[in-house]
Amino acid sequence: MNRRFFLLGTAAQAAVRRPVMGSGEHTYEAFHDWGRLPDGLSWGNTHGVAEDSEGRIYIAHTVHASSERKDSLVVFDQDGKYIRSWGAAFQGGAHGLHLRREGREDFLYFVDTGKGRPGGGVQVTYSCLVKMTLRGETVFRLGYPFESPDYKKDGSTKFSPTNVAIAPNGDIYLADGYGAYNILQYDSKGRFIRSFGGSQFACPHGLMVDTRSAEPSLLVADRTNNRLQRVSLDGRQLGSHNGVNLPCHFHERRGLVVMPDLAARLTLLDASNQVIAHLGEDTTGDWQELRKKPRTEFRAGKFVSPHGACFDHDGNIFVTEWVEVGRVTKLRRV
């Protein structure tokens, strides 16, 4: 072989080599900056991620201040090709996503924190959960929980929900992670049932209905307390797990749970919620400053600030990060 062409070929192979995270059966090839946005749309903080029954990937982001287009929900195919987007009304507050098959149709449960609006802070008139079709049509909207005894009737209690989970019977659990720290339970039609938590949590940022045992329970990412809490579906404490680092949310596939830790790593948990592996962990400790910098300063094979994660139907993992210019990574299982 011509030596020049051999060297060129070797260089080309090196250029496309991807960083690898994990080991053994939990080994993944990392594709950072996954997903090709259309002209005029720029990522803000990338928060939530979910997959529908056709394999399409949904991303919720706050929309960058420089972006001409303001759509906060973006849909891609499995190859990262843009399909559609909508949700300008949620710019600034776009946060948690949960996608659920109901009968013959998929529905998106979308959470708006109420942040990022004129006036600053949390604007509770925007804080909500919206159940919508995959085309963005609203089925129902749950706003300030006037029905709950834990919230003042004049609307003055801070309410800033972060994530949502759905029980097998359709009951909705909404985490008020940036507000009063309660978990609000509704039935499948959006009718209030109860609220619980409060001082029991410190930023219940994410949650998952855990059906891996005979008795389903609620797994709560008690973020500021650096722990996982397990509670019954009616709010009774069942146990806790320490040794996590700012846990954000959960997604489960075949008994394995992926949990984004805000402090620069992704964590895998087994059926007993014990740590199996940390992926892409950056131990330099500068993630809070790094998240504000250009993406050229992000480190390949390392996370900055994972905020959302989900498995796809093949066991690959999609990760969204809380960085000001947005970052979506696909971890391809190898």
Residue ranges and their predicted role:
Residues 1-11:
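N-terminal secretory signal peptides and thylakoid transit peptides that target proteins
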Residues 15-31:
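Blade/loop signatures of beta-propeller domains
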Residues 32-66:
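Beta-strand-rich domains and repeat architectures in extracellular enzymes and scaffolds
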Residues 35-39, 86-90, 139-156, 193-200, ...:
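Surface-exposed loop and turn segments in beta-propeller and other repeat-based domains
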Residues 42-53, 90-103, 116, 147-171, ...:
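Beta-rich, blade/repeat-based domains predominating
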Residues 56-58, 107-109, 172-173, 217-219, ...:
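Conserved beta-propeller blade signature
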Residues 69-102:
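Blade-loop segments of beta-propeller domains
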Residues 305-334:
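Blade-level signature of beta-propeller repeat domains, shared across WD40, Kelch, NHL, RCC1
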